[in-house]
C-alpha cells in the first residue's frame, strides 16, 4: 500500500482533578490562604494520521491534531480575616501548556537497506502559561533530523541534529 490514512473525532473528559491554590489578600500581600479545588477538563478533538510511500525507500508521515481542552468547574474563593474576598474562576479557559493545533511532518529515506536519513518538523500552536490565559507562548516549530547506519548486526551508528532550521546549532 502506498498510503495509510486514519482520522478520528473524539471527546475526552477527566473529572475530579484536585488542587490547592494559594490566594492572596488584595489588601495585604502577606495574607495568603490556601483554597481547595476540584475541577474537570474536557476536550473535543480531531486527529488525522497518514503515512505515504510514493516510491521505494521513501516514507512521509503526517499527523494533524486539533483539540480544544478547557477547564470546567474551575472556581474557588476564600474570605480573609479582614472580610476581603479573593477567588478565581477559570471555567471555560484553555488548559495550560496544551496547544490547540499539533502538526508533525516526518520524511525519511532509506538510501540502502542499512542507511537511512530522516527529519522531523513539529508545530505547536499558541500555549497558555497560566490558568487565567493572560500569558502565553506563541506557536513554534521544532525541527530535528539525522542519519542511521546499521553497520552490522552488532553495531549501529547514528547522528542527530536538533534545530535543523538553525544549522549553526546542530
Regions found by a protein language model. Give the residues of each.
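Basic phosphate/pyrophosphate-binding loop/patch that engages nucleotide-derived ligands
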Residues: 1
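C-terminal beta-signal and adjacent terminal beta-strands/loops
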Residues: 123-130, 148-170
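Asparagine-centered polar/low-complexity signal
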Residues: 36-38, 133, 163
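Short, surface-exposed loop/helix-turn segments at secondary-structure junctions
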Residues: 131-137
Amino acid at each position: 500500500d502506498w498510503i495509510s490514512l486514519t482520522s478520528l473525532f473524539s471527546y475526552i473528559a477527566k473529572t475530579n482533578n484536585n488542587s490547592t491554590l494559594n490566594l492572596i489578600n488584595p489588601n495585604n500581600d502577606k495574607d495568603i490562604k490556601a483554597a481547595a479545588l476540584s475541577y474537570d477538563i474536557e476536550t473535543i478533538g480531531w486527529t488525522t494520521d497518514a503515512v505515504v510511500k510514493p516510491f521505494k525507500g521513501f516514507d512521509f508521515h503526517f499527523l494533524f491534531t486539533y483539540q480544544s481542552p478547557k477547564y470546567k468547574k474551575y472556581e474557588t474563593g476564600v474570605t480573609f480575616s479582614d472580610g476581603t474576598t479573593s477567588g478565581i474562576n477559570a471555567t471555560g479557559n484553555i488548559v495550560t501548556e496544551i496547544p490547540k493545533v499539533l502538526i508533525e511532518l516526518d520524511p525519511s529515506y532509506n538510501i540502502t537497506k542499512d542507511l537511512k536519513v530522516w527529519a522531523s518538523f513539529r508545530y505547536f500552536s499558541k500555549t497558555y502559561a497560566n490558568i487565567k490565559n493572560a500569558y502565553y507562548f506563541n506557536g513554534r516549530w521544532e525541527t530535528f533530523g539525522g542519519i542511521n547506519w546499521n553497520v552490522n548486526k552488532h553495531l549501529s551508528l547514528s547522528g542527530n541534529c536538533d534545530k535543523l532550521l538553525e544549522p549553526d546549532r546542530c
